[in-house]
Amino acid sequence: MRKRISAIIMTLFMVFMSCNNGGPELKSDEVAKSDGTVLDLAKISKKIKDASDFAASVKEVHTLVKSIDELAKAIGKKIKNDNSNFEDENDHNGSLIAGVFQVILTVKAKLTSLEQIIGISDELKTEVGMVKKESEAFVTQVKSKHTDLAKEGVTDAHAKSAILVTDGTKDKGAAELIKLNTAIDELLKAANDAVETVIKELTASVKAEKPSQNN
């Protein structure tokens, strides 16, 4: 995505530079289209960069949330020094649950930071808020089950109902985790769509300008 955006910015610069055929005196970061419209390349570049940076930050949060699916595979396991890598160790999942809990706290903190970014659309802020709400719901549910989850000897069954989204019970956090997964998927799509929208707006203006270059 970043390479694509850099290439687009360079293309825009070259095309708009070819449009600078007189007109008002321009600043170093401005170009003029043939119809006299002055374009600020610095603002254009920043708009693309801001959208790209936001999408990249959302992707980081998305990766953290999805990592819990991998962590859940360690329920009832311990490392083994052979090609099998793991062996069973039932009902000792306290540290694993604490680790997942910390991941979601980190997710919540990152979402709070994303909410405070100036310039993102109200739609994206709403999407961020929805993901944050689901992360808080998971934290609240896990805390409410502290009798079963806030100890070293968390049983495999209880651990699964907390962090395994395919578990049949899902009464200790897994149900909230499913909602969080759905919400972060939707936010990532919205963030990527925002980048594509900015790119389409700018490339459309370039395509509209190109025919005049042959006049």
Swiss-Prot record:
Gene3D superfamilies (alphabetical): Lipoprotein, type 6 (1.20.120.240)
Signal peptide extent: 1-18
Keyword set, alphabetical order: Cell outer membrane, Lipoprotein, Membrane, Palmitate, Plasmid, Signal
Lipidation (S-diacylglycerol cysteine): C19
GO cellular component, one term: cell outer membrane
Membrane topology category: Lipid-anchor
Lipidation (N-palmitoyl cysteine): C19
Compartments where located: Cell outer membrane
Coiled-coil boundaries: none
Function: The Vlp and Vsp proteins are antigenically distinct proteins, only one vlp or vsp gene is transcriptionally active at any one time. Switching between these genes is a mechanism of host immune response evasion.
Additional free-text comment from the UniProt record: Genes for both Vlp and Vsp families are on (usually) unnamed linear plasmids in B.hermsii HS1.
Family, per entry: Belongs to the variable small protein (Vsp) family.
Name recorded for this polypeptide: Variable small protein 3
Source organism per UniProt: Borrelia hermsii
Gene name tied to this protein: vsp3
